[in-house]
Amino acid sequence: NDLVGGCQYSDITVFSFHPVKIITTGEGGAAMTNSLLYAEKMKLLRSHGIIRDKSKMTGNPDGPWYYEQIDLGFNYRMTDIQAALGNSQLNRLDWYVSRRKEFSEWYDEKFHNTGITPLTQKKDRKSAHHLYVLKVIDSNQDNKKLYNYLYQKGIGVNLHYIPIYKQPFFQKKMVNLNIKELSTENADKYYSQALTLPLHPRMTLEMLEYIVNKIYIFFD
């Protein structure tokens, strides 16, 4: 019953407001904490490390324009328009989540005894159903073949996510750190099977049935 973001198991909880997330502000996100120390630090870093509070300054302000930069931050400020956009969606959040849950369970029922299987969710956990990810378990097929087939049918599928060790940045890091071998069997297996289907609260039954029927045809 604990609220998501309550930081019961963490010092800071971060939410993404990317356009494909349940609540969006166009881009950006929010960080939650119960720590006054972390909260003050994040507020400082979000605006170039600049302060205007006289009590925290090292110098003597010579006018109301005076400010001091006491840390190296960046411009992480969210605009008022973005905040208003996100705030306007809060009243519909429960509906968003319930619709995603409804559609996810509908998908689950349709994929019994097929060449794919949904990701399992433990009964004591609660998902916001941001993504609907399934696994291709048919040994005669793979997720990339299914991806290409559905993509050609105009269905917005995706592969989430590429293992980070495959990315050039981390490969360079591995060379620099003299890391020659990694145990990546689970990541590689997941990446070879996972496929993300469209999931949105305003999808229609017709859309869902179109997707499922195309998958049936693929495995037939």
Regions found by a protein language model. Name each.
Residues 6, 31, 134-136:
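Conserved hydrophobic "DFG−1" position in protein kinase catalytic cores
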Residues 26-28, 50:
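Acyl-thioester C-C bond-transforming condensing/cleaving domain
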Residues 1-24, 40, 65-70:
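Conserved active-site segment immediately N-terminal to the catalytic lysine
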Residues 15-16, 29-34, 87:
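Short beta-strand-to-turn element immediately C-terminal to the catalytic PLP-Schiff-base lysine
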Residues 36-220:
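PLP-dependent aminotransferase class I/II
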Residues 22-26, 126-128:
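Short glycine-enriched loop/turn motifs at secondary-structure junctions
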